[in-house]
Amino acid sequence: MSELRFTVEHEWLRLEADGSVTVGITPFAQNALGDVVFVQLPELARHVRDAEVSVLESVKAASSINMPLDGEIVEVNAALDAAPELVNQDPLAQGWFFRFIPDDLEQVRALLDQPAYDNLIAAQG
């Protein structure tokens, strides 16, 4: 599954070939936040269940990123330490936050697909 899945909190998830899942925020979310000036990344090798794992600070607000599914964090995007603006410049690629190994891959597939996410945005419009 290389296509993106989405949460109602405007996070995107992409299942990678190695079974890990990459997480970032959607263009809709980064646009609402404005210019991101700081990203606090999660701890590696930490198993997380439904908890805050990252914090974003922007010129408009601070926002938490919660672990979208249960799993172990295996990688963080260290480039965001020096260049948090990557979240705004390229939220679907270079602006990713972390990767994790999910406890249950089926939970990834059960998240919103692109059409369902588009409907969510339209409803929040």
Task: Locate predicted features.
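Ser/Thr/Pro-rich, acidic low-complexity intrinsically disordered regulatory segments
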Residues: 19, 106-125
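Residue-level signal for threonine
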Residues: 7, 24-26, 113
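Extended boundary segments
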Residues: 1-17
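Compact, glycine-rich, soluble single-domain proteins
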Residues: 12-89, 93-94, 98-106
